[in-house]
Curated annotation (Swiss-Prot):
A Pfam family of this chain: Intron_maturas2
Family from the record: Belongs to the intron maturase 2 family. MatK subfamily.
GO biological process annotation, one example: tRNA processing
Annotated source species: Arisaema tortuosum (Whipcord cobra lily)
The protein's name: Maturase K
Amino acid sequence: MEELRGYLEKSRSIQQHFLYPLLFQEYIYALAHNHGLNVNGSIFYEPPEISGYDKKFSSLLVKRLITRMYQQNYLINSFNDSNQNGFVGHNKNFYSQMISEGFAVIVEIPFSLRLVSSLEEKKEIPKSQNLRSIHSIFPFFEDKLSHLNCISDILIPYPVHLEILVQIIQCWIQDVPSLHLLRFFFHEFYNWNNLITPKKSNYYGFSKENPRLFLFLYNSYVVECESILVFLRKQSSYLRSTSSGTFLERTHFYEKIEQHLVVLCCNDFKKTLWLFKDPFIHYVRYQGKSILASKGTHLLMKKWKSYFVNFWQCHFHFWSQPSRIHISQFSNFSFYFLGYLSSVPLNPLAVKSQMLESSFLIDTVTKKCETIVPIIPMIGSLSKAKFCNVSGNPISKPVWADLSDSDIIDRFGRICRNLSHYYSGSSKKQSLYRIKYILRLSCARTVARKHKSTVRAFLQRLGSEFLEEFFMEEEKVLSLILPRISYPLHKLYRERIWYLDIIRINDLANHL
């Protein structure tokens, strides 16, 4: 990193952020695959399964590839053959992966330098465990949503044209050759379906081949989509606010990839923004799904919807489906967020009041934010993972049958504990208990299948030791967190507990 910083300091005297020559430096591709970028406390993120430097990635191959990319005969050949490029016998994806990995490291450099300089001013380096937990959003929901009236369930629009992505990057990097290469690279090796595709209805999936570059592009695109919120907050910042807070430091890829949290609470905008007068608004996003809640009327939320649709269409030059923004009242609406099914139901309550010798009942209504485990999507997720069938009946997992008994039980127990940890904030535990039951019985059937025995014989052989693997660890954690609580364990499990060490959504819960 010091070498890269020194190179950039020299380049700034010629042209700001002149990054193109770095594509031909050998150490760039070593950095792209080196574990040194992914040690604890690193500002970069890269999944461990794509780590490891491959000697086939070299700057010489990159130089030859870029030269052929700009040759007209190569372009003709590439359009005639979608699977093979100018290098005979090599797959096109090999070279696209090579360039994208090197380019991903290069485009991160200006952002990392900006982060390092800001950290030097603050004299502190953030650790991954200190990043804000995604579970911290739910206490915010519990505190705020019960006082609001309307909610907009928003799916960030797609697709966006490849040229728009280049223009977004151009706002951050003024290196023209690099931008030209990025534009050519997109149109030569990828179409939009390969770049960012909606694998599920509410979040974006990225290319598995080049996750680093596409995570960077996705975050740049989302920041641009949400720029209207930052603009509106700046317009109202001089006005009196009942509560206000922003967490814009999460917007960049290297600090927290999956979460960008913005909270807006203000009384009144200036007259030029008459459309949004008196919008007591809260906005939260995770991946491609966002929630916009307001204390205003349904008409106000329709105005917000119209404004968002028009802004996205005019700014990104594509049609944004209005159906991707769903507006509803809190009293009759449930929304999926971070694997939970959340709602704010109206609970009727009768209060007995007594004055002197007479007494009477007062009917009142209370609102409380409820978060439960969505059992039907969870069963679908467990079914895809081969723990049960589509009806929720547990089945054995034959791919694990070759493991030892202890390894099988340990794997199932770990999955069960992780789900219990993630869904500890559920207000109703029945769905969580059913998921545990499916995993326990699936584990028993897997071990019984391995020994060609029955589930009953397996349970009789292990007895309580088998259940301890699924329950005792959770009981120990709760006893450490709440040591002074004297409630029975079954009452303790009814309480909602939000763990602030969870920084990403559980894989089995990521079905929404």
